[in-house]
Amino acid sequence: MIYADIHTHTAFSPDSRADMADMLERAVALGLKIYGVSEHFNYDYDRLHLQIDGKEVPPIDEAAYFSRALQLQAAYAEKLLFLVGAEFGFDHSPRALERYMRTAEEYRPDFIVNSIHTCLGMDCYFPHYCAGRSKEYAYNAYLYRVLESLDAPYPYDVVAHIGYCSRNATYPDPKLRYEEFADVLDAILRRIIAKDKILEVNTSSKTAGSPFLPDTDILARYFALGGRKVSFASDAHDPSRIGEKREVVSEALKSIGFTHLTIPCRGEHLRAEL
């Protein structure tokens, strides 16, 4: 069974309204031993002036977030290991990279999730990313962005939700399949292993044609290449989704050959048995 969920969001992220204490209470009620928040640091959005619901996304209040999270980390220390993290939306612009490096240095999050949200000038989460583009073109563009992000100059621990572009894709078969993108996926997986990063299994798959991202075919290839470090992420933005599909993910990982999760914690990799 999985007792660690380290990629979630609260009201400090623009797409959540959840109170952090409520999220922690839910994690405790579920019997989690390790719980983490990794709020959005959307400096990739800034350059593109992207909007959500017709409004530009405001920058996170870094000081307020870390202050509140560290207060709760101390308050819940006897109930679970609460990790205070950050999700960096990769962008190659010097301004974004400098801001991420500054955040990592100033606040020293317990862990950092590296992710791709923006591609071809937009957030590839939304259906319009597919408009006028073939699946091959749209997914390749996204995957090569993932590959580029692995060489980010800032420190990071986890490679997030590979297949993010498929979450709301409008193709008849939206699933990101290893066999269709083998070359670039192999390059990604090999680099994750070479850099000793952690591959995230994210259960916020929406309508991607998969119960989690990446799906078992990609996870099996990662294992075959020697990858052993995986983490679990519900990507919950409200308490009801914390730990979602953890039984399904646990069984899938064990069927491939994985025996444990890897938890990033202040520069160390902790082991949590499946």
List each language-model region with its residue ranges.
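An N-terminally biased module of ancient metal coordination in phosphate/nucleic-acid-related enzymes
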Residues: 1-95, 168-179, 238-244, 249-255
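Extended substrate/RNA-proximal surfaces in nucleic-acid metabolism proteins
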Residues: 55-194
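Histidine (H) residue identity feature
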Residues: 7-9, 40, 49, 92, ...
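Charged catalytic cores and adjacent phosphate/nucleic-acid-binding surfaces used
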Residues: 1-10, 20, 31, 120, ...
